[in-house]
Amino acid sequence: MYNKIIKMKEIIENSLQKAISYSEYRILVKELLDEGKSTGLSQSDDLLNYSLLNDKRMKRLDKTIKVSEETIAKLKDVKEPQTWLVLTEGWCGDAAQNLPVINKIAEENSNIKLKLVLRDENLELMDGFLTNGGRSIPKLIALDKDNKVINTWGPRPVVATKMVADYKAEHGSLDAEFKKDLQVWYNKNKGENVQENITSLLK
């Protein structure tokens, strides 16, 4: 057990060395799109199209997401430095909806430093933080000043997670119609559920 903890600490610290800021991530995604590519080890027309859509989505959310007064008040409880390390990819719809919100939250407290890494380039890290056995993203890993894990969040806010689970239970898998409904929910919710979830994890 002790060896596993030491190993994970090494994996986290290796990933932190490669991590980039939110603004650097936005630039990276855009530069790859200009080359006709998405992030990740696999390339396809579908992934490229998802990435193009997500870039537009994130651009809009960067301008429109508002952090609530309640969230700002709760963020004042963070007195010690934290790093929020997030696994993501440009083609991921959930990442596109949630990362702009996470970034806005982190910007409200100078003790919180947001860092991003690409999932496919950090599979050892990803495999330490699976969701129901899957490499689901985005995955936020909150670390203290010694890079010990405080808490984790992701890949979706609680309400969206329940929507996905209920649909899978009834239909077996997620189809295009459901994915459209999920995006409609995200747009209506305007990041409120993400803010509620993440502030409830703050220490």
Outline where the language-model segments fall:
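Non-globular targeting/processing and membrane-anchoring segments
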Residues: M1-P81, D127-G133, K145, I150-K203
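Local sequence-structure signature of Cys/Sec-based thiol-disulfide redox active-site neighborhoods
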Residues: K76-K104
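Thiol-based oxidoreductase modules, predominantly thioredoxin-like and allied folds used
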Residues: W84-T88, I102, S110-L125, S136, ...
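Short acidic/glycine-rich loop or secondary-structure boundary segments that cap or lie
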Residues: D94-A95, E124-M126
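Residues forming well-ordered secondary-structure scaffolds
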Residues: Q97-P100, R135, N193
